[in-house]
């Protein structure tokens, strides 16, 4: 039997029973020196959870929010200064509420949504994953209202979003695998006969 080596558990928080954390985890230091661990949830009903881990032996929940729809998930987030970006993806194409939310977390106990990039569309499941580490640009794997894939499995592409003004995010660029979009001149890429999970972007 394997044993834990050179590590020990010093504390635990059950997140009020909602432990379905996805890819979105970010340790944020506030201006007054507190360390807040923000986490995004893989499925409804919860959206984001913030835990004060300044005292590692005594983690305390500061905030836990609810998703707007039961078909959404918020499995990715990124933070710079007091601005947090959250990805919203739906279970099925065409469902409401998908895109990228922008929050002011200056008050860690009351995240305030100040902006939103809507990527809802008939073939879109919204934003799956985002990456934002510096500068004005966020990098998304997402669908959109104006992107129709030839195969529904190819519904996510690479989008660059200008978030310099967090209240008004604007698309700055995009790329997709040539041949996967309706209207492309290129032929559709070959599909794997057994393991075809799509020619779509997972992480940006």
Please provide the spans of the model-predicted regions.
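Feature marking well-ordered beta-strand scaffolds used for ligand recognition
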Residues: 1-204
């Amino acid at each position: 039997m394997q044993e834990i080596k050179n590590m020990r558990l010093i504390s635990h928080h059950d997140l009020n029973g909602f432990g379905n954390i996805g890819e979105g985890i970010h340790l944020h230091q506030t201006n007054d020196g507190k360390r807040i661990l923000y986490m995004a949830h893989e499925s409804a009903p919860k959206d984001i959870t913030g835990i004060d881990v300044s005292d590692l032996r005594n983690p305390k929940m500061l905030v836990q929010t609810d998703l707007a729809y039961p078909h959404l998930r918020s499995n990715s987030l990124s933070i710079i200064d007091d601005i947090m970006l959250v990805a919203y993806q739906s279970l099925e194409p065409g469902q409401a509420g998908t895109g990228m939310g922008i929050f002011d977390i200056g008050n860690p106990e009351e995240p305030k949504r100040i902006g939103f990039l809507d990527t809802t569309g008939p073939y879109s499941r919204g934003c799956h994953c985002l990456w934002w580490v510096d500068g004005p640009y966020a990098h998304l794997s997402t669908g959109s209202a104006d992107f129709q894939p030839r195969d529904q499995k190819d519904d996510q592409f690479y989008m660059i979003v200008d978030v310099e003004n967090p209240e008004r995010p604007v698309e700055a660029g995009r790329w997709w695998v040539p041949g996967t979009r309706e209207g492309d001149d290129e032929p559709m890429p070959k599909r794997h006969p057994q393991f075809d999970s799509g020619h779509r972007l997972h992480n940006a």
